[in-house]
Amino acid sequence: MLYKGDTLYLDWLEDGIAELVFDTPGSVNKLDTATVASLGEAIGVLEQQSDLKGLLLRSNKAAFIVGADITEFLSLFLVPEEQLSQWLHFANSVFNRLEDLPVPTIAAVNGYALGGGCECVLATDYRLATPDLRIGLPETKLGIMPGFGGSVRMPRMLGADSALEIIAAGKDVGADQALKIGLVDGVVKAEKLVEGAIAILRQAINGDLDWKAKRQPKLEPLKLSKIEAAMSFTIAKGMVAQTAGKHYPAPITAVKTIEAAARFGREEALNLENKSFVPLAHTNEARALVGIFLNDQYVKGKAKKLTKDVETPKQAAVLGAGIMGGGIAYQSAWKGVPVVMKDINDKSLTLGMTEAAKLLNKQLERGKIDGLKLAGVISTIHPTLDYAGFDRVDVVVEAVVENPKVKKAVLAETEQKVRPDTVLASNTSTIPISELANALERPENFCGMHFFNPVHRMPLVEIIRGEKSSDETIAKVVAWASKMGKTPIVVNDCPGFFVNRVLFPYFAGFSQLLRDGAGFRKIDKVMEKQFGWPMGPAYLLDVVGIDTAHHAQAVMAAGFPQRMQKDYRDAIDALFDANRFGQKNGLGFWRYKEDSKGKPKKEEDVVVDDLLAKVSQPKRDFSEEEIIARMMIPMVNEVVRCLEEGIIATPAEADMALVYGLGFPPFHGGAFRWLDTLGSAKYLDMAQQYQHLGPLYEVPEGLRNKARHNEPYYPPVEPARPVGDLKTA
């Protein structure tokens, strides 16, 4: 053994060839600060070996290196700029020394090589991969850019266009694509990986492969003519500006850095990467996006722990076909759980099956499946007008009309047709689960399962625990949602549960702004362009359905009369009374016509202004700051109340539900991350300016306490002390 660290070791393999093996305790290899330091020590040992002829890098895990240790990021981002820059210089000196070894090097890459893992293998001369490879640089999705030389080496290896596509979009690619663009040199079966890598090393050692020529382009300026450079970088900057926008600075910074570094050799190019990385790491956007990643891991880990002792349902059923039922049936069948889809009429069943077939055909068009797979999946969805097969199902989700009487009748009837241990769930969006449970003989086997539309796209499923729902019931439904590829978040029961309960105060803020003379077009523009929502409130209401919102608004008002009961006729009432229900009937705040792809496209409709004038004060101008404050304060206050009342368990789960269920702007990180970034004292000052607008603007006592003591909702993070000898940087 030449060297043994906590996460890697170095040993002779054969005949002057050494192997450096990543072997972190636990299930995956991560390139954390300690591993980078350990890698530097191992390379120091290699530099002393006079009889070294070649080096093989490999992993003892199912994946090569999944990336940097993102749990370190938040504390690393608090390190002062100069110190963080120094540490990056140190880390890059380690990869440079790997790249500069006086012998050929190869990485045998299996499974994932992402982020720092990808940057590590870019420093070797050759890369041999297995068919399950996923390799790429996802850093821009976390609000940063590659910091271990990825923005320098990848463009010089692949050419500017291919590298920009991966780096700016935070993409990863599979084995075939990696081979095609030159990111790996070969693909072999897993059992041949080490043998194949040694064979390539031997060819390089014997002079059959010119490893020095392979290495040289990575040390030099990027070989691009002025015209080629202008075309590549201008197109890339235009596309990034269009897709990422001003709220996500990392992609455009990465492109500009690669452009600026193109004319320099490795050392100066790495200095430019360093100078760009450090300011990005100190942005609120980076902290928010890393926070989302960590919250996502927390939520998924919680679901895994919750379901460890239950069996995932093997057969499911959906009550109520149509678009929603068809979407749920498709998602279940697509992920391998056969489903019976029941309705009371053929027309709805046909609609449900058509929806499932349409979604599968899209997968076929994209080349994700072939005709055989399509037929196989669709054959596991069984449409029926009766309860045939219900005695075999493990879980049933009801997705009928949002009417408590109808839902109770359907659930009570279904309970008599299934096994005593079958779990029932309701896909209600607002009706309390404990109220629906009153119709059942086995309320302990019942809970809520709130999907979001469109089911195949929206990652969140709210799992609602009723007063009598058993732990096993919750666990089984969480297991099914996870199997469907969804992110399940368990919430306690109340009108609207969590997501809709906090959404309707936001809509109330919108209604009050309209009542006071604000224009809906400006509100939408501000909430989309300035705050960052994917849709403004008017457009969102059109998509949700004005009739749906009108009904839900009444349910929420009955549930929370003190805050949500309004004493005036609002815009939602005016449009509802005029039979303007949004996209579903082509008339809402906008008029809708189908484009060439059959998607609804919004157009101006002056009739709306006349309708709104009847429920509004004369038009007046509002600042962007006031619009954002008046829209967001009611929502954030309600989010805080939900945490204080135990409707949602943690800030992490609340923020993920908002991001995954409502599209809360990821660069803000969710309501609690936004609160922490703003500071609760500053938020309190802002909210107090609008207290005269009513109870929705009154800040909950718990948040007032946070403001008094300057306490954040997320645990405070201490700056990291990166491992590594900064003197060698």
Curated annotation (Swiss-Prot):
Q: Does the keyword Isomerase apply?
A: yes
Which positions in this protein are listed as binding NAD(+)?
A: 324, 343, 400-402, 407, 429, 453
Q: Where is this region: Disordered?
A: 708-729
Provide the residue positions that the database annotates as binding substrate: 296, 500, 660
Q: Which domain of life is it from?
A: Bacteria
Q: Which UniProt keywords are present, listed alphabetically?
A: Fatty acid metabolism, Isomerase, Lipid degradation, Lipid metabolism, Lyase, Multifunctional enzyme, NAD, Oxidoreductase
Region 3-hydroxyacyl-CoA dehydrogenase: list its residue ranges. Answer: 311-729
- Establish whether keyword Cytoplasm is in the entry: no
- Name a GO CC annotation attached to this entry: fatty acid beta-oxidation multienzyme complex
Q: Which InterPro entries match?
A: 3-OHacyl-CoA_DH_CS (IPR006180), 3-OHacyl-CoA_DH_NAD-bd (IPR006176), 3HC_DH_C (IPR006108), 6-PGluconate_DH-like_C_sf (IPR008927), ClpP/crotonase-like_dom_sf (IPR029045), Enoyl-CoA_hyd/isom_CS (IPR018376), Enoyl-CoA_hydra/iso (IPR001753), FA_oxidation_alpha_subunit (IPR050136)
**What SUPFAM superfamilies is this protein classified in?**
6-phosphogluconate dehydrogenase C-terminal domain-like, ClpP/crotonase, NAD(P)-binding Rossmann-fold domains
Q: For site (Important for catalytic activity), what residue positions does UniProt give?
A: 119, 139
The pathway that the record names for this protein is: Lipid metabolism; fatty acid beta-oxidation
Swiss-Prot/TrEMBL catalytic activity:
a (3S)-3-hydroxyacyl-CoA + NAD(+) = a 3-oxoacyl-CoA + NADH + H(+); a (3S)-3-hydroxyacyl-CoA = a (2E)-enoyl-CoA + H2O; a 4-saturated-(3S)-3-hydroxyacyl-CoA = a (3E)-enoyl-CoA + H2O; (3S)-3-hydroxybutanoyl-CoA = (3R)-3-hydroxybutanoyl-CoA
Biological process (GO), any one? fatty acid beta-oxidation
Q: Name one GO molecular function term.
A: NAD+ binding
Give the signal peptide as a residue range, or say none if absent.
Answer: none
Instruction: Tell me which EC number(s) this protein carries.
Output: 4.2.1.17, 5.1.2.3, 5.3.3.8, 1.1.1.35
**Which PANTHER family is this protein grouped with?**
TRIFUNCTIONAL ENZYME SUBUNIT ALPHA, TRIFUNCTIONAL ENZYME SUBUNIT ALPHA, MITOCHONDRIAL
| Function field | Involved in the aerobic and anaerobic degradation of long-chain fatty acids via beta-oxidation cycle. Catalyzes the formation of 3-oxoacyl-CoA from enoyl-CoA via L-3-hydroxyacyl-CoA. It can also use D-3-hydroxyacyl-CoA and cis-3-enoyl-CoA as substrate.
Give the record's family classification: In the N-terminal section; belongs to the enoyl-CoA hydratase/isomerase family. In the C-terminal section; belongs to the 3-hydroxyacyl-CoA dehydrogenase family.
HAMAP family attached to this UniProt entry: FadB
UniProt subunit comment: Heterotetramer of two alpha chains (FadB) and two beta chains (FadA).
What is this protein's record name? Fatty acid oxidation complex subunit alpha
Q: Which organism is it from?
A: Escherichia coli O45:K1 (strain S88 / ExPEC)
